[in-house]
Amino acid sequence: MDKFFEYIKNQNLSLEDEKLADKLDQLDQLSSIKEEFYFPITKDIATDLSRVKDEDLDKPVIYLTGNSLGLQPKEIEKQLVCNYLNDWRKYGVEGHHKGDHPFIHIDEEIQASLSKIVGALPSEVCPMNSLSTNIHVLLSNFYKPTQTRHKIIIEYGAFPSDLYVTESQIRHNSFNPETSLIKIKPRDGEYTLRTDDIINVLKEHGDSVAVVMLSGIQYFTGQFFDMKKITEVGHEIGAIVGWDLAHAAGNVELSLHDWNVDFACWCTYKYLNSGPGCIAGIFVHSKHTESFNLSTDSRLLGWFGNKLSNRFQKEKEFVAEDGALGFRMSNPSVADCTALRASLSVFEKAGGIKKLAEKSTIITGYLEYLLTHKLKTTDVQIITPSEANQRGSQLSLLIKGIKASQLKVNLSNSGIVCDVRDPDVIRVAPAPLYTSFNDVKYFIQKLNENM
């Protein structure tokens, strides 16, 4: 919260000013970007319309769950109709090579803008598949267990799919998750992991660790791990280091190339706003793709990872496309890539991830300040770290005195959307693209009324 207090001081604002939210919105250079999005309206979201005032029925909701599914950018509708559907109608199969966005190169068009989101070279990223599939794809290449080095390290309480994928990869390689999967637990009475404890576990298991596979931001607690330091230590013990960035991509500043991360993957429907189930993304550091040898490379192969010049030739030996593109197996969905391209264009309009992260720090700090200073109950506990460099937009709130699921229902009747994770945690994410400071103030007002 220190960054928020520093901002208030630098802007000569007062925390006790009743119009503080108005003044913060006036200072917000990104305030107009929310006009780029469609918002659900209250009558379509509320659980009990009898509890909604008539004048509020058609009001846009306050959407605080972009960490689960981002709002729809208006640009997606435009590009799907005017580009994808129009080109398919107009050109048919020739659309692979005609039009402003030929189908055959549709994913390559996104590489440059996607690389800026995660701090990579364009050649190191590729939109493809879905997140869980991509974890399998990348682990099939990077997890090469031996009798002495066979362990995968994840965090305790990782997103279930990360657990299922790592367990199945271990079994697929004829090892036992009971002995080959290490889960790092928080200390007793704590919800988040201390960096020193993570490092100690890595060093304790040392040369028995094949892969370190953590979440960049922990989905339940909202903790942003020290990826740079953890990657360094992982390499010191001789392990490959990969990251699940589902809750980090589009949320915080990342420098995957400079941090020397081996691989990473993420979905694009949360903070990147591409749409439910839309195409995911991968990162493979350039050091791993400088050369390709079919006899020694263990990646899973498919026709779209093959060089375009070789792709339709019968009985030709596979020659990998350069960089991350060589990990593709199937042709990407043109509709998905069109949606992702459109959603990424909104990031460009906003000035990029750096500006968004700056606003995120301030607006999330404002949310934390109101929760700790203006809430009239002690039945709400923030379990997300207070330090700005250890979180993104999400604050996870442990709720007491009322079931979190019931509180979510009550808030929906007030035109507020957030989500619940058991046991009794509400996740609140003031995504900087479409959340105002007055939105945050209203949330606290309604939280007070419903606790």
From Swiss-Prot:
Pyridoxal 5'-phosphate binds at L131, S132, F159, P160, S161, D162, S215, D244, H247, Y269, W303, N331. GO terms for molecular function: kynureninase activity; pyridoxal phosphate binding. The modification N6-(pyridoxal phosphate)lysine is found at K270. The keyword Hydrolase applies. Its EC number is 3.7.1.3. It is found in: Cytoplasm. Pathway: Amino-acid degradation; L-kynurenine degradation; L-alanine and anthranilate from L-kynurenine: step 1/1; Cofactor biosynthesis; NAD(+) biosynthesis; quinolinate from L-kynurenine: step 2/3. The keyword Mitochondrion does not apply. Homodimer. PANTHER family: KYNURENINASE. Belongs to the kynureninase family. This is Kynureninase. It comes from Dictyostelium discoideum (Social amoeba). The lineage of its organism: Eukaryota, Amoebozoa, Evosea, Eumycetozoa, Dictyostelia.
